[in-house]
Regions:
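Conserved GNAT acetyl-CoA-binding A-motif
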Residues: 100-110, 254-265
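Residue-level recognition of the GNAT/N-acetyltransferase active site
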Residues: 78, 234, 238, 266
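Acetyl-CoA-dependent GNAT
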Residues: 57, 64-70, 177-181, 188-229
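Conserved beta-strand-loop-alpha-helix junction that forms the acyl-donor binding cleft
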Residues: 107-113, 263-277, 289-294
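Acyl-donor-binding surface of acyltransferase catalytic domains
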Residues: 58, 66-153, 290
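Short amphipathic alpha-helix that is part of the acyltransferase structural core
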Residues: 1-32, 144-184
Length: 294
């Protein structure tokens, strides 16, 4: 413990340059932190807070935050054996005035997230609560549910393009956000998000009978794995197995390039979670969203 020190990095690029190889040792749990840091570096975001607890050169715990965003916590072991590192980093964060004022919430895998929350509450004199109970899932091999086999023959998976009805998918995106209790984007914001995803071949659609019936996103392609999100079927087309068939086909395609596929899901959404488990996703960690309550 005598060699423990908190190192603060000038910005997201310096943070990711220094820590990426060690963050990749637990890429599954660190995928959000890696991807957010890269995105903020690309966009030249300023004014955030990027810090790590180091023992010599060894990374023990880290976080990254940019104004207007959640703060993201790094991997912590399932047995909670890293409490000292979370305490040190929470106490350091509480001394950074602009971060204390600006951090409205954070996400971390448990039990580390709760340990950090308790330490930060005490040090900053603020209160936080779980906003969304989340779970992290991992898939390394696709299972094909019997009821999906016929649909897999009838359906086609492909990336959406500018020639597709992107306004339709923008409406689906709003429905997805509403379903997940996420901030509801405007029509213009939804069209922009869908257009951006399709321009880099990250929006995929499931076609049956020549018509799109479900959609999903590929997100955060990293060294070992990638993430999926945005799994959505409009209400009038549900209970036909479209999403399950799409996810089986989509994940099989992703595993041609990546070692694993991951996703973060609301623990309360039992229907979606059942779909994920049917095609081979296994829950690995609880990963909760916390928000300031006072």
């Amino acid at each position: 413990m005598s060699d423990l020190a908190v190192k603060v990095y000038p910005g997201p690029q310096e943070f990711i340059d220094a820590l990426l190889p060690q963050l990749e040792e637990h890429e599954l749990e660190n995928c959000q932190l890696i991807a957010k840091s890269r995105m903020w570096a690309r966009d030249k975001v300023t004014g955030g807070y990027y810090a790590a607890v180091l023992e010599g050169e060894k990374l023990k715990y880290a976080l990254c935050w940019a104004p207007g965003n959640l703060l993201w916590l790094s991997y912590s072991p399932p047995d909670g054996s890293d409490k000292d590192y979370q305490l040190v980093l929470a106490q350091h964060l509480a001394q950074v005035e602009h971060a204390v004022k600006g951090v409205y919430g954070f996400q971390g895998c448990e039990p580390g997230g709760e340990t950090f929350k308790n330490a930060y509450e005490e040090a900053s004199k603020q209160k936080f609560k779980i906003a969304r109970g989340m779970a992290t899932y991992k898939l390394i091999a696709v299972k094909y549910p019997e009821q999906s086999l016929e649909l897999l023959k009838k359906g086609t998976l492909r990336p959406a393009t500018k020639d597709d009805a992107l306004e339709l998918f923008a409406g689906w995106y709003r429905g997805y956000c509403e379903q997940c209790d996420m901030p509801l984007p405007s029509t213009e914001e939804s069209v922009k998000a869908i257009t951006n995803l399709s321009s880099v071949e990250m929006l995929y659609i499931w076609i049956v009978g020549g018509e799109p019936v479900s959609m999903t996103f590929k997100l955060r392609p990293l060294k070992y794995g990638t993430s999926v999100a945005g799994v959505y079927t409009p209400p009038e087309l549900r209970k036909r197995g479209y999403a399950t068939a799409m996810m089986a086909a989509f994940c099989a395609r992703l595993l041609e390039t990546f070692q694993f596929v991951t996703l973060h899901a609301d623990k309360e959404n039992t229907t979606s979670n059942h779909i994920y488990q049917d095609v081979g996703f296994v829950k690995t960690r609880d990963t909760n969203d916390y928000e300031r309550s006072e």
